[in-house]
Amino acid sequence: LKPLLEASRKRVAEGKGPLFQSHMFDGSILPLEENMEISKKLLAECAELDIILEIEAGVVGGEEDGHDTSGIPAEKLYTTPEDMVQVHESLNGIGRFLFAATFGNVHVAYKPGAVQLKPAILKDGQAAVEAKYGAESRFDLVFHGGSGSDLSDIRETLGYGVVKMNIDTDTQYAFTRPIVTHVCENIEGVLKIEDEVGNKKTYDPRSYLKKGEQNMSLRMAKACEDLCSDRKTIFGTV
């Protein structure tokens, strides 16, 4: 993150915009106090550059990018109201940030019913912060590990302040599935079998990557519907 901020700092000094409009720092594996100390410093740097910082407290279960949290104690999978109050006290007033609190959410794919989300954790945490610091203290929350979640859970989190949901696993599958179908249905054209030459039209990457892109776009459209943001922009409804 530091090199990216430095690149943005140089761009801003030249009268340009920052390299990115937002960054994420995941210090959830650290003790909360250490996490917040690092987050405060990064948020201050981001604020100077008009960059939003996304931070995380509480551990999202499962595995992501080779990082496995299966050995983490169960209580670490749930952000407490006290945690949320501490995050507010640590970061309020420094700059614009989003907060990924954890409520049983996990990375990677699980069978339906295997993941037990507790969206009420977000409700309770927001209430604790609001009771102490007022309605303006409510967080803009991020839902990590949203792939495969029940629509009812997704919609419930929206009422508790979720403004962003991550669905990396779902979009990966949406992209890959039609490509697999293409290969299976055109196996003799994709491969050069028994001295045959195959079919360039079927092994041309453009022929199947386009299908992946189209299916991913459909999954993204569904996500917009799930999050009640379809046909909406930051300027209003279209």
Which residue stretches match the model-derived regions?
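Alpha/beta enzyme core
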Residues: 1-137, 151, 155-156, 160
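Exposed alpha-helical structural elements
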Residues: 83-86, 178, 215
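Residues that form generic nucleotide/phosphate-binding pockets
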Residues: 90, 178, 182, 226
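Catalytic-face loop-and-helix region of soluble metabolic enzyme cores
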Residues: 111, 121, 128-208
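Extended, intrinsically disordered, low-complexity segments
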Residues: 185-238
